[in-house]
Design a protein with these regions (language model features):
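Catalytic core of membrane glycerolipid acyltransferases/transacylases, capturing the structured
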Residues: 16, 30-88
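Residue-level "edge-of-site" marker
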Residues: 26, 89, 143
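A generic structural signal for well-ordered alpha-helical segments
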Residues: 13, 53, 76, 100, ...
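Residue-level recognition of alpha-helix initiation/capping sites
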Residues: 3-4, 44, 67, 91-92, ...
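Short, charge-rich binding segments
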Residues: 27, 51, 86, 98-103
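Non-catalytic C-terminal accessory region of glycerolipid acyltransferases
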Residues: 92-200
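Membrane-anchoring hydrophobic helices of lipid-metabolizing enzymes
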Residues: 1-35, 44-45, 73, 78-80, ...
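Generic preference for hydrophobic
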Residues: 22, 36, 60-61, 81, ...
Length: 200
């Protein structure tokens, strides 16, 4: 069903001219599990990342509200997403992605929410999972169409992958150090991507 969902999304985004132009694909690890931590502005970035990585499947951490939206809920569920309750995160927030990584799967985390505090928590979550699972993190940035309205206006999307890294720091101190590193990478990639977007 992932294949069907990915192809449905691909056709829609392509027809509307919103399928992302991708940079830095050489930075993606060729095999094994890893985390892809991508900037987040709306739900179109989730769809574009899934399409860009296809046929490799990503298991997305997605806020549970997305699963409750008509149509989009079906797509998100069948793009291997698993729900996360940001208000009451339980141990499964760490356990599920850690297990997927150990199985060699790719986990997608969108660590910049609408509020900066929310973004920091999710960045630290990505770093914690990478630290415990001893998995690589690939930072990524998305700029462009954010929602159905943008897609209907034929808004374009742009995606860039940065260089992967391991969380080599230990304990809380290591997590804080690498959370800052991830924040820096995401800002730098967003700036780099904005330079590459053709001026209208």
């Amino acid at each position: 069903v992932y294949k069907l969902a990915a192809n449905v999304v691909k056709v829609i985004l392509k027809l509307m001219g919103s399928k992302a132009r991708v940079y830095g694909e050489e930075n993606l690890p060729k095999e094994g599990g890893f985390i892809i931590a991508c900037t987040h502005t709306g739900y179109v970035d989730i769809l574009n990342l899934g399409v860009a990585m296809y046929p490799r499947e990503i298991h997305f951490m997605a806020k549970k509200q997305l699963f409750e939206m008509k149509g989009l809920g079906w797509l998100v569920k069948h793009l291997n997403a698993f729900p996360v309750d940001r208000d009451n995160p339980g141990p499964s927030v760490i356990k599920i992605p850690s297990q997927l990584l150990k199985e060699g799967k790719i986990v997608g985390i969108f660590p910049s929410g609408t509020r900066s505090a929310d973004g920091t928590d999710l960045k630290q979550g990505a770093i914690t999972i990478a630290q415990l699972a001893k998995a690589q993190i690939v930072p990524a940035a998305y700029v462009g169409a954010r929602n159905a309205g943008d897609v209907m206006k034929r808004g374009k999307g742009y995606l860039i992958y940065g260089e992967p890294f391991y969380v080599t720091g230990k304990g809380k101190e290591g997590r804080e150090q690498f959370t800052q590193h991830l924040e820096h990478e995401l800002v730098a990639l967003t700036e780099e991507l904005q330079k590459r977007i053709p001026v209208k």
